[in-house]
């Protein structure tokens, strides 16, 4: 996250987690001098941060003018709060979105029977599951998008969705902003001018991801309405939310309906895309139920949560890359974040999978997802089942604490998952720490990234107590220790009150009913307090 010595170009690209390019580029940074800088430019912004070209910081755009804001904090959290006041606060995701998501994976073969076998497996193993996601092959292959269920695989989609709802599940489906030439919708979209064009008057197309791919023009109000109606039909059928994939590979030689500069639209396109989808969800589901799962973003995109890290390999290196990228994103005003638990590309070892599950279920949002193989725990080993169950139940029991922090995120812009330096700015040991994080204002989590089960982590000054074991440790020190798979360094900051729910089988329940308050290392004469939100977000305030 420390960019000193780097050249950083703000330019969205589809690059996975193991490259210098990024799906989400935000022209914003903060410094240890008490201020942040936001460059208000939709196109490419180039930053030289004490690189070989400049001694300090320089940023430039290819334009006739440059607008930027200097934001005084003085603390990093205050800078982020003011930055999101300027560019938009993150919306509050629904409670159910904080539970465990399971997917079909990307290019696997599946039908309703396959999906039922996964859901049955979770129920039989007592693993709480909140959301089931259908990736691209809910539609007929290479007709993406046609917004129609593949009848060969899903002959009764409305009935299927109703059956899943009766089992207490929410349903997500994969979409993108593309219309393939094979899609039955292509002719209509071309005829009515809903697609990006070339300067010769023809539709802009390429074969990068599927033959004859065209791109919806979200600067055209009629195209937005047309696209929205397709999504509304799915919501009426029983779909609850959408995974808004892609949005990065946007051409710089296209012609837009409203005459927009295609170079400036390259980064900004994803904002319009996700805004359209999020507005449909708010219209049909209500503001309290709107949530999507987005890969690409630009400044202001935090208003349309949730975002996930993108394509990563299934190994420890990529697991660590994912966290580092996530903390960079949340430091840029994005309040909620997720990643592909177990890794996306290839298939992880059981060891990596189990460690990633602990990390993933101690993230704001948790999704098991892969590319060519399924991510159900029993595909790895029986111990993996125990690990997923344990941490899924732990997260459910932490919902009173997590949801309080989620509400604060929506009010202030301060992220749920935050880098150590955001909370402990004066502690120089935290400046470069990107392998551990604060989950909310009281919990410190340090995932394990080694196959020898060794955890290496740092506790800042103060008294820290393990949430899992009750062990008390002195801060201002580094620790090295071995952990089993049902363990992770998870410590509570001194002076904290953590509200623990009475249930561990679901993310949605009355958090105030039967709640337990755990007080940690309270000092004499100091008053601590916490808040619990009940069924309709009413407050219950406790002072100790």
Where are these regions (language model features)?
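Catalytic and substrate-binding clefts that recognize carbohydrates or anionic sugar/phosphate headgroups
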Residues: 1-95, 103-106, 112-113, 119-124, ...
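Residue-level detector of short, conserved catalytic/binding motifs and their immediate flanks
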Residues: 24-28, 33-35, 66, 98, ...
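A residue-level signal for conserved active-site and pocket-lining positions in enzyme catalytic cores
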Residues: 28, 83, 122, 164, ...
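Short acidic-glycine loop/turn motifs at beta-strand connectors
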Residues: 30-34, 41, 199-200, 460-461, ...
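Active-site pocket-lining segments that scaffold enzyme catalytic pockets across diverse folds
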Residues: 111-113, 117, 132-135
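Aromatic- and carboxylate-enriched substrate-binding clefts and catalytic-loop regions
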Residues: 128-388, 423-425, 433
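Catalytic core of carbohydrate-active enzymes
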Residues: 278-290, 297-308, 321, 325, ...
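Conserved small/polar residues in nucleotide/adenosyl-binding loops
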Residues: 542-544
């Amino acid at each position: 996250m420390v960019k000193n010595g780097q050249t950083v170009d703000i330019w969205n690209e589809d690059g996975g987690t193991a490259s210098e390019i990024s799906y989400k580029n935000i022209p914003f940074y903060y410094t240890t001098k008490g201020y942040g800088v936001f460059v208000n430019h939709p196109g490419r912004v180039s930053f030289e941060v004490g690189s070989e070209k400049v001694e300090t910081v320089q940023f430039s755009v290819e334009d006739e003018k440059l607008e930027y804001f200097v934001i005084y904090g003085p603390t990093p959290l205050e800078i982020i709060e003011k930055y999101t006041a300027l560019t938009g606060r993150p919306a509050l995701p629904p409670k159910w979105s904080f539970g465990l998501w399971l997917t079909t994976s990307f290019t696997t073969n599946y039908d309703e029977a396959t999906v039922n076998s996964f859901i049955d497996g979770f129920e039989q193993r007592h693993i709480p599951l909140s959301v089931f996601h259908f990736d691209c092959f809910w539609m007929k292959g290479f007709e993406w998008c046609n917004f129609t269920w593949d009848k060969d695989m899903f002959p009764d989609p409305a009935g299927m969705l109703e059956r899943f709802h009766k089992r207490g599940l929410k349903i997500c489906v994969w979409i993108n902003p593309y219309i393939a030439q094979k899609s039955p919708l292509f002719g209509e979209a071309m005829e009515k001018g809903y697609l990006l064009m070339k300067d010769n008057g023809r539709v802009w197309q390429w074969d990068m991801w599927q033959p004859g791919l065209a791109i919806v023009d979200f600067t055209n109000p009629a195209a937005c309405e047309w696209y929205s109606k397709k999504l509304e039909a799915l919501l009426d059928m029983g779909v609850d939310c959408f995974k808004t994939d892609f949005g990065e590979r946007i051409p710089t030689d296209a012609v837009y309906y409203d005459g927009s500069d295609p170079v400036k639209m390259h980064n900004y396109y994803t904002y319009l895309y996700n805004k359209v989808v999020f507005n449909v969800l708010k219209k049909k589901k209500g503001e309290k139920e709107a949530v999507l799962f987005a890969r690409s973003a630009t400044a202001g995109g935090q208003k349309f949560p949730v975002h996930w890290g993108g394509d990563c390999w299934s190994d420890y290196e990529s697991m660590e890359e994912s966290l580092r990228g996530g903390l960079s994103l949340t430091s840029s005003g994005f309040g909620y974040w997720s990643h592909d638990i177990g890794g996306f590309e290839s298939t992880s070892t059981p060891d990596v999978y189990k460690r990633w599950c602990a990390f993933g279920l101690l993230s704001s949002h948790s999704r098991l997802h892969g590319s060519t193989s399924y991510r159900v725990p029993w595909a790895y080993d029986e111990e993996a089942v125990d690990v997923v169950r344990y941490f899924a139940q732990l997260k459910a029991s932490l919902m009173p604490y997590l949801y309080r922090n989620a509400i604060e995120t929506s009010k202030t812009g301060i992220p749920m998952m935050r880098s150590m330096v955001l909370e402990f700015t004066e502690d120089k040991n935290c400046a470069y720490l990107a392998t551990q994080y604060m989950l909310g204002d009281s919990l410190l989590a340090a995932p394990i990234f080694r196959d020898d089960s060794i955890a290496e982590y740092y506790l800042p000054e103060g008294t820290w107590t393990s949430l899992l074991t009750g062990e008390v440790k002195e801060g201002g020190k580094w620790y090295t220790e071995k952990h089993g798979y049902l363990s992770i360094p998870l410590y509570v900051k001194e002076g904290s009150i953590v509200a623990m729910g009475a249930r561990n089988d679901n993310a949605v329940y009355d958090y105030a009913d039967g709640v337990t308050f755990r007080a940690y290392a309270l000092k004499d004469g100091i008053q601590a307090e916490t808040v619990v939100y009940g069924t309709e977000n009413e407050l219950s305030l406790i002072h100790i």
